Amino acid sequence: MERVAKLASERAVVVFTASNCGMCHAVTSLLVGELGVNAAVHELDKDPRGRDMERELARRLNGGGGGGRALPAVFVGGNLVGGANRVMSLHLAGELVPMLKNAGALWL
């Protein structure tokens, strides 16, 4: 979907979430609160086209097959990184901060 691609490239870090999603809140808190990233956060449950975008994200996250959890979906430098498990794994492995720096999302 063209809208997902357009929104995903609007900033160095873009997070697609839902307002009632605990894992979405955890990922957003990590990126924005703990790491200080100026991410664009899109709450799809508040967007009239959110359901269509969530389906597209599920397709991308699950290898084209759809199904499974679509949110949160995190893009860094316009590229899909993945969901909560992937972001947390990268952070614990020490790989998230360098990725964010390379995308221009962190300066320190």
Curated annotation (Swiss-Prot):
**Where is the motif (Responsive for interaction with TGA factors)?**
105-108
Q: Which domain of life is it from?
A: Eukaryota
- What compartments host this protein? Cytoplasm; Nucleus
Q: Which cysteines are joined by disulfide bonds?
A: C21-C24
Cite the entry's keywords alphabetically. Answer: Cytoplasm, Disulfide bond, Electron transport, Nucleus, Redox-active center, Transport
Against InterPro entries, the record matches this protein to: GlrX-like_pln_2, Glutaredoxin, Glutaredoxin_subgr, Thioredoxin-like_sf
Glutaredoxin domain ranges (all copies): 1-107
Q: Which SUPFAM superfamilies match?
A: Thioredoxin-like
Q: Name one GO cellular component term.
A: cytoplasm
| Annotated NCBIfam families | GlrX-like_plant
Q: Which PANTHER family match?
A: GLUTAREDOXIN
Family of this protein: Belongs to the glutaredoxin family. CC-type subfamily.
The record describes the protein's role as: Has a glutathione-disulfide oxidoreductase activity in the presence of NADPH and glutathione reductase. Reduces low molecular weight disulfides and proteins.
* Protein name according to UniProt: Glutaredoxin-C10
What broad taxonomic lineage does this protein's source fall under?
Eukaryota, Viridiplantae, Streptophyta, Embryophyta, Tracheophyta
